[in-house]
């Protein structure tokens, strides 16, 4: 036990020991630590011209979303899903029936990450062309069921760029949370385009499943050591000034809003405060206590980045950056 107390500063990660520099950390110091922590794991793109031959997602429109409360931002992510099948623009049968015209079929296969979370909202973006024929019905979304094709509850709206956006209702979300599902768009008079810029796509917003707190990673030492860390110090005053602080940070403030596009901001949790010198065991051993994150309780931050000005996106993770529990160790 005594040896463990000596070794704790050596085995704790540097991010957990950041508060040992003192309790007077101002905003600029915290921002500098966040910048350094992010750059340890992510690399900003070099300035370059956008690649014109890459399928472009309409970044201006897709990234317009409802503001998420700061306390929920770190648990919310957005997924852009393209169909896993090509768009057939020719009839599969020469004697295709007239009522089959204007039916577009798309197969979607969500990722394992998306399936592990709760779907909170979804939109289907479908390019319906510059003008809709007045003698045709409005576009609609259907899905397949044992009874055949059934309508999906969705509200349709058009954008100035000639896209029809289907906002799915809550009753439709369980159908979109399957490992494999088919969506059909009925749009008589709409063009059938296989061009990548006009490919339909699904925008899904998800959050962590509401099963309580996120599961913590295993502590890499014995339960006895963890018990030692969780126990208050012999000097109660050593813990009175150690707490978890929070700071709302925007990526625009960090100068990265053209690189990290979602979330636009996040709540940075960190350990803050001093640990007074006690007169117990730690004082006799000459060990300085630090206000730091309890090992095994740090959480990661998931972000969506672009390296070509919004033509493509990818998800990246900054591990162990958000403190959940703080203590004097």
Swiss-Prot record:
Residues 1-16 form the signal peptide. GO terms for cellular component: extracellular space. Disulfide bonds join 242-291, 271-326, 275-328. CDD domains: TGF_beta_INHA (cd13754). The keyword Disulfide bond applies. PROSITE patterns: TGF_BETA_1, TGF_BETA_2. Glycans are attached at residues 135, 248. The keyword Signal applies. It is found in: Secreted. Residues 17-60, 61-216 form a propeptide. Dimeric, linked by one or more disulfide bonds. Inhibin A is a dimer of alpha and beta-A. Inhibin B is a dimer of alpha and beta-B. Belongs to the TGF-beta family. This is Inhibin alpha chain. It comes from Gallus gallus (Chicken). The lineage of its organism: Eukaryota, Metazoa, Chordata, Craniata, Vertebrata.
